[in-house]
Every structure is written in structure tokens, then in C-alpha cells.
Amino acid sequence: MSNCVQILSDENGIQVCFDIQQEKVMAIGEEMNAIQEEAYMNGENWDIFLQYYLAEYAPEVLVGMETDPEAGMYAAYYDSTPESEAKAKKLAAVITSLLEHPEEIYRILQEAGDEIEWD
């Protein structure tokens, strides 16, 4: 798992935290912004991009998910259930895969960036 993405859990629920201020993530965000001018990659726009991506490629992860994007952090929350734990693990794996293969992000922006309703 990327050191940019962590899964935290307790009796209140499961949280997937994505630190968007890491150097690698910032570099990906800068390239995203170069491709799509409206894609200034703060927490809100990472939320918007991930919502778009997940709706297309992993819609089951969105079921029961709540998000709280901040300036330097993206967080997703699930209830504390075995099903939600599996969804959180998949979400973390999706984010990690995108970070390891940012060309997928860039491809989506080139093909559909204007369809995404950026912040």
C-alpha cells in the first residue's frame, strides 16, 4: 500500500485517508492541471475525480461511502461492517494503483476531462 493512502478503523467506522500533499501526489496533480486547466488538485477536486472514476470503474465502492475532502487530505468513510471493510480496501487499492500508474489518470482527463464537473 502506498504511504499516501491509509486505512484506519475503530468501532465507529472505517476511514480511507489519502494524503494529497505528498510530493508524488503533488506532481501528479500538477500534470493533471496541465492537461485540464480546471483540475486544480485540492482535496475537493480529488474527491470529484475519484467519484467520477469510481462511478465508471468500481461503482460498488461508492455504496455507503461518505467523503470529507480538505485542502491537503481526501478522506472516505464507511460503516464498520465486513462489507465496508472490503470496500475500503478496494478504494485504497484503486487510489494506490492510480498513483502507481498516473498515465491512467492522464488518459481519462484527455478523453473526458470536460465531462467532469470540477470545483
Task: Describe the function of each predicted region.
Residues 3, 21, 97-100, 104-108:
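Aliphatic-rich, non-membrane protein domains
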Residues 1-26:
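N-terminal, charge-rich interaction modules
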Residues 46-104:
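Amphipathic protein-protein interaction modules
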Residues 17-63:
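Surface-exposed, low-hydrophobicity interaction/linker segments
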